[in-house]
Swiss-Prot record:
Monomer. Interacts with CRX. The lineage of its organism: Eukaryota, Metazoa, Chordata, Craniata, Vertebrata. A motif (AF-2) lies at residues 456-461. A zinc finger (NR C4-type) spans 21-41, 57-81. Nuclear receptor that binds DNA as a monomer to ROR response elements (RORE) containing a single core motif half-site 5'-AGGTCA-3' preceded by a short A-T-rich sequence. Considered to have intrinsic transcriptional activity, have some natural ligands such as all-trans retinoic acid (ATRA) and other retinoids which act as inverse agonists repressing the transcriptional activity. Required for normal postnatal development of rod and cone photoreceptor cells. Modulates rod photoreceptors differentiation at least by inducing the transcription factor NRL-mediated pathway. This is Nuclear receptor ROR-beta.
Amino acid sequence: MCENQLKTKADATAQIEVIPCKICGDKSSGIHYGVITCEGCKGFFRRSQQNNASYSCPRQRNCLIDRTNRNRCQHCRLQKCLALGMSRDAVKFGRMSKKQRDSLYAEVQKHQQRLQEQRQQQSGEAEALARVYSSSISNGLSNLNNETSGTYANGHVIDLPKSEGYYNVDSGQPSPDQSGLDMTGIKQIKQEPIYDLTSVPNLFTYSSFNNGQLAPGITMTEIDRIAQNIIKSHLETCQYTMEELHQLAWQTHTYEEIKAYQSKSREALWQQCAIQITHAIQYVVEFAKRITGFMELCQNDQILLLKSGCLEVVLVRMCRAFNPLNNTVLFEGKYGGMQMFKALGSDDLVNEAFDFAKNLCSLQLTEEEIALFSSAVLISPDRAWLIEPRKVQKLQEKIYFALQHVIQKNHLDDETLAKLIAKIPTITAVCNLHGEKLQVFKQSHPEIVNTLFPPLYKELFNPDCATGCK
């Protein structure tokens, strides 16, 4: 194929990617098996055809398939793939008829026009939002360190409160929220379109902060209060203090211990990891419950944000317990590398998680920054079925405002926040891959998942079991 043909094909693919995935609405990567899809749906369809998979739907065979819940029902996802024309025998883009290509380009133009209209509408909002953030340079959160330094000696966490339902990681006290999240009575309400922070050029860079003022109704006192509350909540709900992590840094699993992990059955190691993930999620739930702004959201939105974002926060927090010098992570009291998780049969998931942790560590985030970024990831207005997405969005904007100031105080690199925001799709992708791997594991070991996995884990990542497999 000559150079001009390659360029034409690349240009065509780039144009096609303007159209969202026809299956789940995520960002598409081109035409796969005859339909415009994302990489996730392409891989799902390929695996379903290779394995001649037979899926069943536990509900009424009319499950909604979108970016957030596409992994919840494989039957309905596959049926949607087939209904929209996905096929192993589908023609490739270059072999389409002129009529098919014209129809496709008309759709591309329609989406491009819609995006242009959205950008014009958002530009006014971007200017207003930039004004909200702008005075962080001159006013800042100067009192933040002064007020927190007296509470946390040497920047380390104070002892966890010995309240009922919460415990120190090494104590024998009960875990929080063992009963899981109450999802009864949730109505599926169509999410209204919202403003995407990441789509606005230079919004979070230093140069976008001029001599503006806070938007009406927002004060620096409020931003300061939110930041202090989030940082305090984070420090009080981390499984390990930084001091403890430093002490454990070179406590690594021995060769014999690593061999023991590798010789475990796939079922046993999956169960072990599910327990550890659930343990970490319980701390994230407690973190969220201590955030004042989060608790002011309606209960429906609190639950939806936790269900869709808790694992993402666990992944962000993982960087605290990751040693980039030898690529090891803290697991069951000692550090170990990727080879420890070989028995899972999910090397790609483990690789992605480790790569993300290493990349996040390279930014050398402080505890303040991890706290604020974690809360921004959790309190995300683009989650499906939120009742009050605008309220969630406003809270997230205030968190990003505080985070931007803290970053500018700690880093010479003006682009640290932009780099953090750019990592959010990777966080989502790793968590989606976890969901896909769990579904594959469940197909071959349904009884293990149904009877031995923690109830909270099942409720969050395997909702079919949470309701019918107690």
